[in-house]
Amino acid sequence: VIDDYAERWALVTGASSGIGAEFARMLAARGMHLILTARREDLLKELATDLDTRHGTRTEIIVCDLSEPGEPKRLFDEIAAKGIQVELLINNAGFGFVGTIDETDAERMQQMLRLNIAALTELTYLYLPGMSERGHGGIINVASVAAFQPVAYMPVYSAGKAYVLHFSEALWAEAREKGVTVVGLCPGTTETEFFDVAGVSNWLK
């Protein structure tokens, strides 16, 4: 998916750390220009400086909380206003937490659904038509191995990742004839801040 995009623009969500930051490093090494978005401006600036030093990467930073309604469209509009054409979309932003459904804070659950599902879907909806019209583009939606089975104590998270996987597979079939590649990426256990946020950093030991 990422081998023929040199000198083109990629948008990476959740780019401040973990898998998103690694995607940014990998794409920069392949000669792509990057739009990096996340909530933490300091980490985005640090990453952009490092990529410029190592690869001379053209980088735009947009601070954005995609779990907030309206933010995916604001991000899309701000990028369009810069005259940037996104050829590769990495929908990586997301989080999870552990607990039974009756222990779950309702607002935190809604925040996770908005970020893991709604924002990913909206950004795909916004960018896919342009890619299809141009006959070229790629979308990588980061799911999880949790997509393949129900996970007790993470029921909403695992169900959400199943959505991401099935959504991606369906779009792969729809978009491939238009020159657009859609991939659902399902990482296994990866040492990132995810486990700290989920309150289960001991799982990595």
Spans of model-derived segments:
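Conserved glycine-rich Rossmann-like NAD(P)H-binding loop of the short-chain dehydrogenase/reductase
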Residues: 30-47
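Substrate-binding pocket helix/loop in short-chain dehydrogenase/reductase
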Residues: 100-101, 105-113
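Active-site helix of classical SDR
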Residues: 124, 160
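The beta1-alpha1 cofactor-binding region of Rossmann-like NAD(H)/NADP(H)-dependent oxidoreductases
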Residues: 41-42, 63-74, 106
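SDR active-site lid
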Residues: 166, 172-205
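Residue(s) in the substrate-gating loop at a strand-loop-helix junction
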Residues: 144
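Conserved glycine-rich cofactor-binding loop
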Residues: 9, 16-17
